[in-house]
């Protein structure tokens, strides 16, 4: 029990400003939905969580999506085990920025770290009054979310609503599972990297060449 509880998982949420990252974190950790928008006021959270019989110490990091934080935000990426990359189902711009901004940023600062793609504000996509008030709005469909997941290589795609708490727990359960039980392809990539490093090292020793790096 002690050994499993000592497993620490750092989960970092990223995505455009105002897509609901902070609300999702507050909802998950306190079962409350903040009615007012307050940009990124979530304190880092850490607690023991049990998923599929495994106890882990889950650490949650919130980040600001605004451009003013572009230099500071990557500091939170160091040591991340998994990213929750969020966009709003009622914001086409935030959906498009997953490919334009967030994937390049994560690949640059944290290559190889698994991503859970999340579509937030599910309740608004199905809210007729909200859609009538925003006649030019074209919500993101589930199929489009799945297509984006394939494009960026995310481990899974989940749609959630912090207001109704629908699938909020599922988001972070998925983030934990991808770390403690990596997908087969991810494990295979790690094994291949290890084999390539060993092969390169052995060849270097055999030929008595000076090694300056591992590939």
From Swiss-Prot:
- Name a single GO cellular component: plasma membrane
Give the residue ranges of motif Effector region: 37-45
Keywords of this entry: Cytoplasm, GTP-binding, Lipoprotein, Membrane, Nucleotide-binding, Palmitate
* Main subcellular location of this protein, as a coarse class: cytoplasm
Q: Which domain of life is it from?
A: Eukaryota
Which InterPro entries does the protein's record reference? P-loop_NTPase (IPR027417), Small_GTP-bd (IPR005225), Small_GTPase (IPR001806), Small_GTPase_Rho (IPR003578)
Q: Which residues bind GTP?
A: 15-22, 62-66, 120-123
Describe PTMs of this protein: May be palmitoylated.
Compartments, record wording: Cytoplasm; Membrane
Q: Name one GO biological process term.
A: cortical cytoskeleton organization
Q: Which GO terms describe its molecular function?
A: GTP binding; GTPase activity; protein kinase binding
Assigned protein family:
Belongs to the small GTPase superfamily. Rho family.
Q: What does this protein do?
A: Inactive GDP-bound Rho GTPases reside in the cytosol, are found in a complex with Rho GDP-dissociation inhibitors (Rho GDIs), and are released from the GDI protein in order to translocate to membranes upon activation.
| Full protein name | Rac-like GTP-binding protein 4
Q: What is the lineage of its organism?
A: Eukaryota, Viridiplantae, Streptophyta, Embryophyta, Tracheophyta
Q: Which gene encodes it?
A: RAC4
């Amino acid at each position: 029990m002690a050994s499993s509880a000592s497993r620490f998982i750092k989960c970092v949420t990223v995505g455009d400003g105002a897509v609901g990252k902070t609300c999702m974190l507050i909802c998950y950790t306190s079962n409350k939905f903040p009615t007012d928008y307050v940009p990124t006021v979530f304190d880092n959270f850490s607690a023991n969580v049990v998923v599929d019989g495994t106890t882990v110490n889950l650490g949650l990091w919130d980040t600001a999506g605004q451009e003013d934080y572009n230099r500071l935000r990557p500091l939170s990426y160091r040591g991340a085990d998994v990213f929750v990359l969020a966009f709003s189902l009622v914001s086409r711009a935030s959906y498009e920025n997953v490919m334009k901004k967030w994937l390049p940023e994560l690949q640059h600062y944290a290559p190889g770290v698994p991503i859970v793609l999340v579509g937030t504000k599910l309740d608004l996509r199905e809210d007729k009054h909200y859609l009538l008030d925003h006649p030019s709005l074209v919500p993101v469909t589930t199929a489009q979310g799945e297509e984006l997941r394939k494009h960026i290589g995310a481990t899974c795609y989940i749609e959630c609503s912090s207001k109704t708490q629908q699938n909020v727990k599922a988001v972070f359960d998925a983030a934990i599972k991808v770390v403690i039980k990596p997908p087969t392809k991810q494990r295979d990539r790690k094994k291949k990297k290890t084999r390539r490093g060993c092969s390169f090292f052995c060849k270097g020793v055999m030929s008595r060449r000076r090694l300056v790096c591992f590939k």
